[in-house]
UniProtKB/Swiss-Prot annotation:
Higher taxonomy: Bacteria, Bacillati, Actinomycetota, Actinomycetes, Mycobacteriales
Subcellular location: Cell membrane
Native source organism of the sequence: Mycobacterium tuberculosis (strain ATCC 25618 / H37Rv)
Segments traversing the membrane: 15-35, 38-58, 59-79, 181-201
Name this polypeptide is given: Uncharacterized PPE family protein PPE13
Keywords on record: Cell membrane, Membrane, Repeat, Transmembrane, Transmembrane helix
Membrane topology: Multi-pass membrane protein
Main location as per UniProt: membrane
Keyword Transmembrane found: yes
One Pfam family linked to the record: Pentapeptide_2
Domain of life: Bacteria
GO terms under cellular component: plasma membrane
Length: 443
């Protein structure tokens, strides 16, 4: 697995997980102790051989004594070489711990990476009109910087660790200085696998290649109490887990159960976040599959507190709802806020296929309608289009106002003109000619 293509969530979590440099420093102390013991044994053995063979009055005389001294010389050389190897292993462990501490200090903290991702999620969920696009771009740029920072730290860590490893000499080469009678395996050791020659730097480990830990069962584990292969951390059960207390395979974080989970306390497969149960959830506290957000229960929900399938928004109960729903009732295909029923758009509607505000029937549009297919305001019947049919449909309910003086004057003038026209018409009918217009002054 190439760490250069891994996101900062993986690299940061890996470098910060586990027991840290403490086990490596403890191994360095142990190697120092072993080197001291081997050095004391070599000095004591050399002094003893010298006392037996040196001078004419020594205890060992003759050809047999010379042969014994020659046979003891390789063991003295082996003790001196083993002392040097143990001192080198102690120095290598200290150098490895220093390289790790430098890499950890140069790596972005997992909390900083998680804060960046949470900020991006918040900006995306609230980006209804595109107002958060500059902030989203800035957050992504910061994420790229975190990625580059982690890659640079891991490159330095890889180079330092490789240098330390190249300076170590395999212990198998040291056995070549011993006589054949010692290097030959006893009869009871026939069939022992050669892989057991791989050193395991730890205590009470069972397996091959377990480093820097205690009580690992399996192969190539780093940490303590791991069961399986290639685990890094403490108390993992499975394979390729990075963190603490994971059960399954390839989990990154702590307390995960399943496969390919990233975060903490996830139960299932391929969850990103914390406390998710199911598959392909992103966020926290989701239960189901394909949820994006917080506290969703169901499948393919986006938002928070949704219960059902394919809801977008918050507190929707049912399926295919968009907006903010009622947390205590169930609806289907609603858009808006607080709707209960099916196919509503608007606010606080109950029934089916309504649009507007606080309609109680089916197919109503407007405000406060309590019947079906009504449009307007506060209708109580069916298929009404006026406002407030409870009083507007009754003629007796309309208010009666007294006529004004202008209305009275207009009425009287109209009546006078009508009377004059009637007199003229009656005269024409009786004489056959219109009345003559008088000329001159009228008295």
């Amino acid at each position: 697995m190439n760490f250069m293509v891994l996101p900062p969530e993986v690299n940061s979590a890996r470098i910060y997980a586990g027991a840290g440099p403490a086990p490596m420093l403890a191994a360095a102390v142990a190697w120092d102790g072993l080197a001291a013991e081997l050095g004391m044994a070599a000095a004591s053995f050399s002094l003893l051989i010298s006392g037996l063979t040196a001078g004419p009055g020594s205890a060992w005389q003759g050809p047999a004594a010379a042969a014994m001294a020659a046979a003891a010389a390789p063991y003295l050389s082996w003790l001196n070489a083993a002392t040097a190897r143990a001192e080198g292993a102690a120095a290598g462990a200290k150098a490895a711990a220093a390289v790790y501490e430098a890499a950890r200090a140069a790596t972005a903290h997992p909390a900083l990476v998680a804060a960046n991702r949470n900020q991006l999620l918040s900006l995306v969920l609230s980006n209804l009109f595109g107002q958060n696009l500059p902030a989203i771009a800035a957050t992504e740029a910061s994420y790229e910087q975190l990625w580059a920072q982690d890659v640079a730290a891991m490159v330095g860590y890889h180079g330092g660790a490789s240098t330390v490893a190249s300076q170590l000499t395999p212990w198998q080469q040291l056995l070549s200085v011993l006589p054949p009678v010692v290097t030959a395996a006893p009869a009871g050791a026939v069939g022992v696998p050669a892989a057991l020659a791989i050193p395991a730097l730890g205590v009470e480990n069972i397996g091959v290649g377990n480093f820097l830990g205690i009580g690992n069962i399996g192969n190539n584990n780093v940490g303590s109490g791991n069961t399986g292969d290639y685990n890094f951390g403490i108390g993992n059960i499975g394979n390729a887990n990075l963190g603490n207390g994971n059960i399954g395979n390839a989990n990154l974080g702590s307390g995960n159960a399943g496969f390919f989970n990233f975060g903490n306390g996830n139960d299932g497969n391929t969850n990103f976040g914390s406390g998710n149960a199911g598959f392909l959830n992103i966020g926290s506290g989701n239960e189901g599959s394909g949820n994006l957000g917080f506290g969703n229960a169901g499948d393919d929900n986006t938002g928070w507190g949704n219960s059902g399938d394919t809801n977008t928004g918050g507190f929707n109960s049912g399926d295919l709802n968009t907006g903010i729903g009622s947390p205590v009732t169930q609806g289907v295909a609603n858009s808006g806020f607080g709707n209960t029923g099916t196919g509503h758009s608007g606010f606080f509607n109950s029934g089916n296929s309504g649009s507007g505000f606080q309609n109680l029937g089916n197919g109503s549009s407007g405000f406060g309608n309590a019947s079906d297919t009504s449009s307007g305001f506060q209708n109580a019947g069916t298929a009404l289009t006026r406002a407030s049919s409870t009083w507007a449909d009754s003629p007796r309910a309309w208010p009666i106002r007294a006529p004004s003086r202008l209305q009275v004057w207009r009425t009287r003038a109209t009546t006078a003109r009508e009377c004059s026209i009637r007199v003229i018409i009656s005269r024409v009918s009786s004489t056959g000619a219109p009345p003559q217009k008088k000329v001159g002054n009228s008295g």
